[in-house]
Amino acid sequence: LPMHSLTGWSVPLIIIFTGILVMVYSALGGIEAVVWTDAIQGIVLIGGALLCFIMLMIDLPDGFGGFLKVASANNKLSLGEMGLSLSKPSFWLILFYGFFINLQNFGADQSYIQRYIGAKTNKDAKKSVWLGSLLYLPVSMLFFMIGTALWVYYQEFPALLPTDMAADKVFPHFIVNQLPAGLTGLLIAAIFSAGMSSLSTSVNSSATVLLSDYYRKFSKEKLSENSSINFLRLSSLVVGILGILVALAFNGVASALDTWWALASIFSGGILGLFLLGLLLKTIKPKTAMIAVGVGLLFILWTSLSPFFGFSSLLH
């Protein structure tokens, strides 16, 4: 969206260009290229976000104090509703979701685990887990604060924001129209980095799973190193193309974040439970575990998709 606002290029064209770029360096450089680019992109992302928040505070009439005053008066700094409703994003529901989704990410997600395996020693792998865990909360808080600061900013300067603008487009609009030229480029690079980092990680981890769990397992001949590398590169290209097609299909959704949460819950549903079964209950048979995962997936599909087909959901 920032690139679209800045250049006027169509969003589908930007999706295709970005996807091809990520596919190329993921396929040619492998996990080393992904880790190094992710590290650099992460630094750019956090640095850009900090600068953006500072600029917002500078531009507000009363600075940080005024931001806190307006945000507090409009209940924008609260932790959310404290009720126990399952149909609203209450504090307890988000806390419950956050605990289990991060337990799955750090314990069962291939895109995380391959980084542990790629570390030189177990000690280095543990350090990466602690670093990621400790950074997660402050970085998330930073972006939440930017969202709140944007709300306060456009309460102070409502004429600067088109009335019919979708929520996902407010941040790109601010970056392109309110920031100095050099800082605009840095912030666009930061947001671009976030998207590229997520895509490259998914491409590389998916290709690794296809090689380790399918191609090597079902191949009748022992694979040479060159054959494995070629398969990884081909898989990276195929997965990257599929990712581009999915992104194009979901272009224009009302909320990218809500859509991501819904898709993540559907496609990753049951995976954490499966890993915990294997870790804690050694006597569970594979068939029993797969039935449990299947039932869990059906339940998630029902709760997530039933409103789109006119059926009542258990949560509503």
Name what the model sees in each region.
Residues 1-316:
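Membrane-embedded helix-loop-helix hairpins and adjacent transmembrane boundary segments
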